[in-house]
Amino acid sequence: MKKVLNKYSRRLTEDKSQGASQAMLYGTEMNDADMHKPQIGIGSVWYEGNTCNMHLNQLAQFVKDSVEKENLKGMRFNTIGVSDGISMGTDGMSYSLQSRDLIADSIETVMSAHWYDGLVSIPGCDKNMPGCMMALGRLNRPGFVIYGGTIQAGVMRGKPIDIVTAFQSYGACLSGQITEQERQETIKKACPGAGACGGMYTANTMACAIEALGMSLPFSSSTSATSVEKVQECDKAGETIKNLLELDIKPRDIMTRKAFENAMVLITVMGGSTNAVLHLLAMASSVDVDLSIDDFQEIANKTPVLADFKPSGKYVMANLHAIGGTPAVMKMLLKAGMLHGDCLTVTGKTLAENLENVADLPEDNTIIHKLDNPIKKTGHLQILKGNVAPEGSVAKITGKEGEIFEGVANVFDSEEEMVAAVETGKVKKGDVIVIRYEGPKGGPGMPEMLKPTSLIMGAGLGQDVALITDGRFSGGSHGFIVGHITPEAYEGGMIALLENGDKITIDAINNVINVDLSDQEIAQRKSKWRASKQKASRGTLKKYIKTVSSASTGCVTDLD
């Protein structure tokens, strides 16, 4: 008996009582033969106003062509996106993290309302990646991700530059390290075309995680946006989704606990973004896999940082692809017993089978260090707890900034206040900069602090100050930084009670973050604290404040 591949779409196309549905489909130029084909949603996060996303419509057409060669019916649709790079440092960043959940909601909505049988999702930027994955997990219909791809490095006066060079140019100009003319040249040459930010920032981090999970094709995460290889990846979409339909392989068959462990190992080795903690927690929630921030610490305790990527290192993703790409790194880790090779992937094969014929990394490469010569012996993503963060926080400690910082609190109730303080010389060596009321509810939207960290680095204070916040950090942030502090200030967490001059210790060796205050003093301050007014009174941000969970549970919006 022939297997039914259109088991969802036939609800509309073959049921005589759905005449109006069929009339509208005929009106889209479908014919009689099309009515019996499996319908594949092709969900692109295309929009013109961002280098990460500007080319995705073209990729979606390549995917549609590939799907239809396999006697399937491709149905393209778009969802929204927010460019962190464009909105960074403004109130627009409040909309960034919540766009992840809106993307998941909208893809789930279109796929469910229109009864599509499978999904090929095409994200390009930071929050696009987990948003598409959360939708795949919720729907649990055959599907996979095609990453829009990474950007090529910019070049200025013979030297490679990227988006973080542009962010740091303002601080460098303020401190006299570069001229205004050099700043202008930097921002005009940092982004040479389509593709996601080139270092191990959030988009590339999540692309690596998705490939390690088995939810994208091999090499997807390291192939550049404008390469022939990215077109070839799109050309494989039809046979890939048809195979998934025929074998009835669904996301929950692939996104298992062991697969998430593979993802956590790879992003640790790669030196990935702190945002991966939030996003992997949210992705795991979408498939009912029990994952917690403590699991990240367990992985960090036994996994080294090997990749020398920007922002703290030298290289970008295009450099890695030139020497073998992400699969070559995974093959090295598999040989070392650090990955679960028996995990199923969207090829229909196991991870180990996918990697069997992948070439090894060159012995003399300088991008990926050998296991016996790591950049850092343990993971850079450290989960810190203590009286400042009883429910946890996430530190990004590469080792270059040290592992212990003791200093005095310099407290700001917004990102803007802190930026003004740096500009006027009110941030000094030895400060623990505290930026609060920037959490999921308080921000709202838990905005990223790339502007403050870039300003600190550009001003030459990167080795001399620490920054803690209930907000997030961009994948482009580096320095001695601790984010995701929970409970957040808006909910009366300890970060709301800190005052200028408080002595704070950040210890990434023992995983603690404490303020030197007695329980009596803390209780006294707590009794005086009053909740602040919601920053959003209408619309999507108000709904987000009411539904979002804490950073330690992934900032998801569909928990009970």
From Swiss-Prot:
Mg(2+) binds at D84, D126, K127, E448. It is an enzyme of class 4 (lyase). Its EC number is 4.2.1.9. Binds 1 [2Fe-2S] cluster per subunit. This cluster acts as a Lewis acid cofactor. The modification N6-carboxylysine is found at K127. The keyword Cell inner membrane does not apply. One of its GO terms (biological process) is L-valine biosynthetic process. The keyword Repeat does not apply. GO terms for molecular function: 2 iron, 2 sulfur cluster binding; dihydroxy-acid dehydratase activity; magnesium ion binding. It catalyses: (2R)-2,3-dihydroxy-3-methylbutanoate = 3-methyl-2-oxobutanoate + H2O; (2R,3R)-2,3-dihydroxy-3-methylpentanoate = (S)-3-methyl-2-oxopentanoate + H2O. PROSITE patterns: ILVD_EDD_1, ILVD_EDD_2. Keywords: 2Fe-2S, Amino-acid biosynthesis, Branched-chain amino acid biosynthesis, Iron, Iron-sulfur, Lyase, Magnesium, Metal-binding. [2Fe-2S] cluster binds at C52, C125, C197. Belongs to the IlvD/Edd family. Functions in the biosynthesis of branched-chain amino acids. Catalyzes the dehydration of (2R,3R)-2,3-dihydroxy-3-methylpentanoate (2,3-dihydroxy-3-methylvalerate) into 2-oxo-3-methylpentanoate (2-oxo-3-methylvalerate) and of (2R)-2,3-dihydroxy-3-methylbutanoate (2,3-dihydroxyisovalerate) into 2-oxo-3-methylbutanoate (2-oxoisovalerate), the penultimate precursor to L-isoleucine and L-valine, respectively. NCBIfam families: ilvD (TIGR00110), PRK00911.1 (NF002068). Homodimer. This is Dihydroxy-acid dehydratase.
